[in-house]
Amino acid sequence: MSDEEHQFESKADAGASKTYPQQAGTIRKNGYIVIKNRPCKVVEVSTSKTGKHGHAKCHFVAIDIFTSKKLEEVYVPSSHNCDVPHVNRTDYQLIDISEDGFVSLLTENGNTKDDLKLPTDDSLLTQIKDGFAEGKDLVVSVMSAMGEEQICALKDIGGKN
């Protein structure tokens, strides 16, 4: 067997879990939770009292961090574990916008990241396109969770006038 037959494609997460368990009773407003297999930010938590047949239960209302859709998880026993997504936010300098809607971003180590599309949020999309057209130095914040990535914010770091 030659070496070519044993080439493995390296993945950035190296098999790391996309979520971690957290007891439902400890998840608070503005924390994160997985509801219906989607990473969400918790906007409301209510807890019912312990009944004669069991546990206190938690009710979560949360917003999907990528689609902004409202999701609810109804009455999870507070002692049970819920999945919580690993959420990361990374800043990249915007280098280019392609005609097919992909952005070219400069990473910290000097490489380019070219696999991300422009955001679907209209106001953010307009700010990015207008700022880029004006030749401003723009830095975009990319939120990543559960294998998805999306541009979520924009900063002008002092432009070429």
From Swiss-Prot:
Entry keywords, A to Z: Hypusine, Initiation factor, Protein biosynthesis
Record-linked InterPro entries: IF5A-like, IF5A-like_N, NA-bd_OB-fold, Rib_uL2_dom2, Trans_elong_IF5A_hypusine_site, Transl_elong_IF5A_C, Translation_prot_SH3-like_sf
GO MF, one example: translation elongation factor activity
NADP in keyword set: no
PTM note: Lys-52 undergoes hypusination, a unique post-translational modification that consists in the addition of a butylamino group from spermidine to lysine side chain, leading to the formation of the unusual amino acid hypusine. eIF-5As are the only known proteins to undergo this modification, which is essential for their function.
GO biological process: one example: positive regulation of translational elongation
Compositional bias of kind Basic and acidic residues: 1-12
Presence of keyword S-adenosyl-L-methionine: no
Record region (Disordered): 1-21
Residue numbers of Hypusine PTMs: K52
Domain of life: Eukaryota
Role this protein plays: Translation factor that promotes translation elongation and termination, particularly upon ribosome stalling at specific amino acid sequence contexts. Binds between the exit (E) and peptidyl (P) site of the ribosome and promotes rescue of stalled ribosome: specifically required for efficient translation of polyproline-containing peptides as well as other motifs that stall the ribosome. Acts as a ribosome quality control (RQC) cofactor by joining the RQC complex to facilitate peptidyl transfer during CAT tailing step.
Entry's family note: Belongs to the eIF-5A family.
Protein name: Eukaryotic translation initiation factor 5A-1
Organism: Medicago sativa (Alfalfa)
